């Protein structure tokens, strides 16, 4: 599947690697162990009603070495405790939001790889059909 979500001018592909460690180490090297845990923690912050760690997660790559993770489910209820926002995001929008929170949270770690991934993911989020919902979900967590 070349473009599993509708994002204008962005080509995204599903990573077919079966093991989390393999795909994360390709993108994040020695700090890869932080990324999966960080994204799952941020996902739990956004959706504390559902055990997101137990969901099946997929890895998505886009040009220029970007990567994000998203659960393989339908819409996910989210709540932002800092702003009071409540809503639902598609799995891709949810994964983008959780990944952004993790990458920004780890800024300064990994020799710039977190910042690079956050920057690329911001471009994707800005072109996503659920841009406003993603922004509302992460508002107050990222300065």
Residue positions per predicted region:
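Amphipathic, interaction-prone secondary-structure segments
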Residues: 32-76
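Polybasic, proline/glycine-rich intrinsically disordered low-complexity segments
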Residues: 76-143
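Intrinsically disordered, low-complexity segments enriched in small/polar residues
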Residues: 8-9, 27, 64, 135-138
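Negatively charged, low-complexity tracts enriched in Asp/Glu with abundant Ser/Thr
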Residues: 4-51
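Short amphipathic alpha-helical segments, especially helix-boundary/capping motifs
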Residues: 18-21, 73-77
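Short runs of predominantly hydrophobic/aromatic residues within well-ordered alpha helices
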Residues: 20, 56, 93-96
């Amino acid at each position: 599947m070349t473009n599993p979500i509708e994002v204008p001018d962005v080509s995204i592909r599903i990573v077919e690697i079966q093991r989390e460690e393999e795909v994360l180490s390709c993108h994040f090297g020695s700090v890869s162990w932080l990324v999966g845990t960080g994204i799952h923690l941020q996902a739990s912050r956004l959706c504390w009603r559902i055990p997101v760690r137990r969901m099946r997660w997929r890895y998505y790559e886009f040009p220029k070495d970007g990567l994000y993770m998203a659960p393989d489910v339908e819409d996910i209820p989210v709540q932002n405790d800092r702003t009071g926002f409540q809503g639902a995001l598609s799995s891709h929008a949810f994964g983008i939001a959780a990944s952004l929170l993790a990458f920004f949270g780890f800024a300064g770690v990994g020799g710039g790889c977190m910042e690079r991934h956050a920057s690329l993911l911001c471009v994707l989020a800005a072109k996503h059909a659920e841009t406003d919902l993603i922004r509302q979900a992460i508002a107050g967590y990222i300065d």
